[in-house]
């Protein structure tokens, strides 16, 4: 629940794509057991935007970005977490967008960010979704209220994924129980990630054994029903599972190809 500020040139440049990289504890004063959740380019955002945070226990918080303009080298508390809770997602929002939250047991909720009042940096936050016993949040994203081209991509630990139009997720009130988003079976395993995507995006899948697979979002058909398991997106080695995914926006892919 802490925030740090770091200049890009302070991160050592990797020799190649396959390099191990530099441990974050060597560039940031992270506490034992602390890990980075989200990175935001401060040069690309304006003073009138917010940081919207979502935790594993379903707590949400909206704070003006100006609260984090003057960050000490040692960092600042961004949100006061309950014991055992972890920050899952941090997104930049405009104040009039919708928030989508997805859980491990296949539940999702969409609500207006205006349902969450602006809070000071030291605040705890409020309930974003009412979780069932044993459930936790695994992903969250931002949707424009009038956007028709966005989709929601859900993937399970065994590599089963599906893509739905964002319009399939109807607006609810903050703090509700949500609705069924994914059919979990012994074959699929639990949900590990829920992300907002677009047709021209790519997804980078990272497995527990360190395998990296990159595929086009267009390879996954858009489904009408939400409460389904989807299709096998990638074949993993026996015993391996999906650990996490990263969405690569289409605009960044075009920049790569131009280079």
How would you label these PLM feature ranges?
Residues 2-259:
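Short, structured "edge-of-domain" segments at secondary-structure transitions
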């Amino acid at each position: 629940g802490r925030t740090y500020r770091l200049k890009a040139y302070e991160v050592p440049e990797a020799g190649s794509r396959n390099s191990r990289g530099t441990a974050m504890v060597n560039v940031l004063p992270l506490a034992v057991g602390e890990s980075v959740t989200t990175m935001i380019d401060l040069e690309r955002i304006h003073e009138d935007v917010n940081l919207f945070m979502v935790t594993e226990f379903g707590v949400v918080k909206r704070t003006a970005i100006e609260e984090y303009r003057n960050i000490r080298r040692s960092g600042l508390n961004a949100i006061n977490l309950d014991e055992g809770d972890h920050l899952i997602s941090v997104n930049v929002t405009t104040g009039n967008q919708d928030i989508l939250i997805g859980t491990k047991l296949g539940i999702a909720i969409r609500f207006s960010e205006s349902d969450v009042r602006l809070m000071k940096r030291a605040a705890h936050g409020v309930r974003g979704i009412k979780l069932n016993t044993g459930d936790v949040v695994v992903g969250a994203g931002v949707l424009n209220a009038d956007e028709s081209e966005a989709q929601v991509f859900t993937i399970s630990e065994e590599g089963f994924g599906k893509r739905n139009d964002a319009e399939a997720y109807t607006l609810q009130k903050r703090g509700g129980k949500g609705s069924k988003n994914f059919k979990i079976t012994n074959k699929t395993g639990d949900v590990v990630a829920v992300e907002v995507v677009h047709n021209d995006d790519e997804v980078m899948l990272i497995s527990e054994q360190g395998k990296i697979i990159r595929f086009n979002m267009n390879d996954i058909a858009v489904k009408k029903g939400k409460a389904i398991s989807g299709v096998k997106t990638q074949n993993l080695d026996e015993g391996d599972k999906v650990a996490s995914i990263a969405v690569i926006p289409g605009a960044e892919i075009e920049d790569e190809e131009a280079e």
